[in-house]
Amino acid sequence: MLLVIDVGNTNIVLGIYDGQRLVRDWRISTDKAKTSDEYGILIRELFRGADIEFKDVKAIIISSVVPTLSGVLERLSRNYFGYSPLVVGPGIRTGMPIQYDNPKEVGADRIVNAVAGYEKYKTSLVIVDFGTATTFDYVNRKGEYCGGAIAPGLVISMEALFQRASKLPRVDIVKPPAVIARNTVNSMQAGIFYGYVGLVDEIVARMKAESKETPRVIATGGLAGLIAPESKTIEAVEEYLTLEGLRILYERNRE
């Protein structure tokens, strides 16, 4: 079995693959203070609930946008599984030309998503990933990663509103009953939700115009399912896009 680990600023997503089949997946909170032993104990409990043992895992691949946790999880891999993991970063074989001024600046998660998206659709793509930041990535019809845009994530936007405006409460991110809201909570939800739908559609529209192609638009990330139904541009939600990209990259880098 292959263990894939996607480390984000807010959540860590883990998946177990048996060949090309995703057997189980878990989402846990990112905690920069946790040690490799603490993560090891947590993963053991997750595995126990799925009737999986450490010895069942034969390889590990990690994508991380949190540098302080990269070393922690590499130690976890060696100490608990007996393997040095494959880490997504400079030098890894992606099979995708990266047309970025400095390829080392591109977040690992963005490349992983691009690889998975192009492998599935084999056409030009806009990939919208609703994470701590919301990223928009463009892959052209030749399968080249061309770059994209980065916007504050939904949760960051809502938290900023709560923290910087004294009289505004912290609220859940949900679709409100109306745009013309009749109370403060719904008003905040309307502004964030519909404002974000507009942000997504406008950036996607401009990417399409600039590219002079007709890309397929897909979304992933924890809040993709909330925004996509209201978006005029998102055509599909790929819940496991990043995990699938990690599996593909592992296969491309096997010795």
UniProtKB/Swiss-Prot annotation:
GO biological process: coenzyme A biosynthetic process
Signal peptide per UniProt: none
Keywords recorded for this protein, A-Z: ATP-binding, Coenzyme A biosynthesis, Cytoplasm, Kinase, Metal-binding, Nucleotide-binding, Potassium, Transferase
CDD domains for the chain: ASKHA_NBD_PanK-III
Binding of K(+), residues: 129
Keyword Nucleus listed: no
Subunit organization: Homodimer.
Name this protein carries in UniProt: Type III pantothenate kinase
Species of origin: Geobacter metallireducens (strain ATCC 53774 / DSM 7210 / GS-15)
